Amino acid sequence: MATAPRLADWAPDSWQRHPTLQQPVYKDADALGRAVRSLAKLPPIVVSWEIDELRGRLAAAQQGRAFLLHGGDCAESLDDCESDRIVRQLKVLLQMSLVLVHGLRQPIIRIGRMAGQYAKPRSSDVETRDGVTLPAYRGDNVNRAPFDARSREPDPELLLRGYERAALTLNFVRALIDGGFADLHHPEYWDLDFMRHSPKYEEYRAVVAALSDSLHFFESLAGKPVHDSHRVDFYASHEGLHLLYEQAQTRYIRRQERWYNLSTHLPWIGVRTAALDGGHVEYFRGIANPIAVKVGPSADADYLRELVRVLDPDREPGRLTLIHRFGAAGIERGLPRLIEAVQGTGHPVLWVCDPMHGNTESTPSGHKTRRFDSILAELETAFAVHRAYGSRLGGVHLELTGDNVTECTGGARGLSDGDLARAYRSTVDPRLNFEQALEVAMRIARLQGGR
């Protein structure tokens, strides 16, 4: 695929000349410098040809020939980098993609919010409890969640620990996939132990049986195995928030004559850091990766037109994904102006719905949660609005886990506020559990099946 030449007015550190939000303040500048220099010497976590391959797949999704499934933890934990948990996360994403393949009848692009999702933006730099004020928890590659002075102090060494865990995670995922874990002949490999008790299990098994029958039919017809049915492509993604970390993993690839962020395949910019004059937009405009930006109620038409111009000046297919997040109550009013603004520019973008962040609320018990009905309502409205405006919703962005947690209420099991304390494990935002995630995939398949 032809690529645009590198920018003459950009460098991996040019963002430092711009106002940059959500960056931790480190007491020991020398220790920070040592950590960043070490990161810059370490091998990349991903490689440029994987990134280029993903850009091509996202271009197909922009054209309506594929659908993006983008999901994983709100914030990964260094302590959760263990084989069983990674397997469960991969299983639920594979199960969802199987349902979507069956329902949508098109390729599914599988991207995990994993192998690097260790930094989180916060609404305040500090947190106060019982009269004690400490730095806010910003994710495990910055500081630690326990509310004590030592844990909350930003530690440069955690940048290296985050890199190590990200590399271990993605290496394990690759080994599983290359070893046949994702073989379409054996979807039973993906079953979660506790899934058999789910109200949606039989519906899922029916999808598996239908796909298995189709696969065997085509193999019988062809007289040989279906090409590439023994593995799937899987990509990693995280919010490119901590720019010193991202800068350290940005490398110049001579054969492409471009700079790539080799810490992940698809980095994204969050709503809080997407200012046109900010450091994040400056950094992202210069890397060759496909990139995504979260947009919501605060984005107006003029801003969005300028954003797509700055981030994708060459109108490169597969380059730019826009992830909209409004909430069920606001999407019908807010989304049309964004669609019309982008349509007027002629830039190719992939529209993706994040039905999670706009639907977060707090219960009287103090738990943050999301109502499953609100999540589904935002998704359904997103599909309808895009159709009404001659656009296409090409993907979904979800915070989810393969664990049997109780963080979002509702779903087939009818979880209530009273269930939240039973298995609430997230340190930041509530996630869909395996059952709710699969139910979302089934709803998308029903909404879009046959279109």
Give the location of each predicted region.
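Non-transmembrane, aqueous-exposed alpha-helical and coiled segments at domain scale
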Residues: 319-350, 357-406
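Active-site-facing alpha/beta catalytic cores
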Residues: 75-76, 80-327, 367-370, 378, ...
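Short, well-ordered loop/turn elements at secondary-structure boundaries
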Residues: 63, 263, 286-288, 345-347, ...
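Long, contiguous, compositionally biased segments that the model treats as domain-scale units
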Residues: 1-143
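Short glycine-enriched loops at secondary-structure junctions
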Residues: 115, 356-357
